Amino acid sequence: MPFTPAEDELTEALIDLKSRDPQLGIAKVHALLLRNYPDWSVSEKRTRKILQYHGLIVSSSSSPAATANEPPVFPSSRVMDQLDVKQWSDKVQVKFFNKKKGKGLVAVTNIEEGDTIWKEEPFIVAPEWEIYDMQRNSTACGYCTTPLALDSPLINVCPASSSTMPAASTSTNPCPTRFCSRLCLARSAKVHPILCPVQNPASAPLLKFARDSQWMALHALIHTTARILLVNQHGIETLRKDWDIVQSLAELGMEERFKYSFKSSAAPEPDRAVWKKAFTLYLQAFKEPKTPPEQKKFAKLLKKPLPAEVEHGLFDYDAGFLRGLGRMSLNLEAHGGLYVLHSHLNHSCDPNVSVRHLDQRNALSRITVLAKRAIKQGEELTITYVNPKLGYAARQHELRSWGFGSCVCARCIEEEKMARQAPSGNGGGDAGEVADMDDLAAELKAGLGVM
């Protein structure tokens, strides 16, 4: 006897069918659905509603190469005119492709398989939580994230903890942060002072909130904002350089991300209350500390006001905070670092580049970019944003969760053809993988702060 499927179950089935043949119209998708699920009772009106809700309607104006399951809004980015790529590598250059794809990196010479294309230190690093906890427990470097040899004579403690300055009444505990060398201690001055619980105790509740909610995008925005605030104390030129880097990153606001990437019948609205709570703590940490002792310490760190445009870009709720969160989530490397040149790399399900953390004894946060295969002059360098072991439909599903639309790399085009040619009864593998993505999607939403 036919029964009415649950909304989530029906949505997954329709996404899978559209992934197999994106050009199918509503009537054909509906007919295919009923053929594949003969015990379901679903009206064409309900099918249409779900397809429209998820942006899966074929537009009559679409080109043959376009796919119907691409979101109507894509991340935007801009090219940095003053970026000196040669400080990292003489093998690549930045190229702007088009408004939809944005910028990327192309080879300026032939690159052999296994070649090191460049090494890069992070602009900021908001490490994955396991390493962050090690930093808080004084067992990993507070700058480069390398695990500490606790008996090493090279270890340096936070200056605020080793000085004779009186502790604030709001905190009698020393800063737990340690550094593996004097070099890391010196470099940490770009970010650490304003996140130090002794020097700026107002930052502690914000960092705790990010940790408790395991919100990596917020954690990265915290470090980025700290860097901008501190670099402003050194002059307008250094501020402009760093601010230009931040503004050039690919971005998609939190509201847009949720509307076009995460929205579902099960979670029709984002948890805006959490966003507002985070924003309140963000302002208290970086602009308006709550108590007079906190305000006094904060004033010692930041004596120069920000230019109006930078202040707006950091502290306006929509144009600053929410868009900043979107930038972080789109550009973070897997382990929590934000890297200037690395952020230019686009996605392919058949990437020609891999990113490794090879300096694990003395610079864990440094990345090394290696050629997975030979790359010809003029060819774009790509990495994968998703697990390449997933099937076609599951990879497309995950990319949509990031707001990137459909991948049209050579591998995806070939696998889509194979899926379309396969008998309908033999195509359940990817559908299962798409279903398996629900747990990952939930984890992703939590990390980006939309749950």
Predicted regions, residues:
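Short alpha-helical interaction motifs and adjacent low-complexity tails used for partner binding
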Residues: 1-451
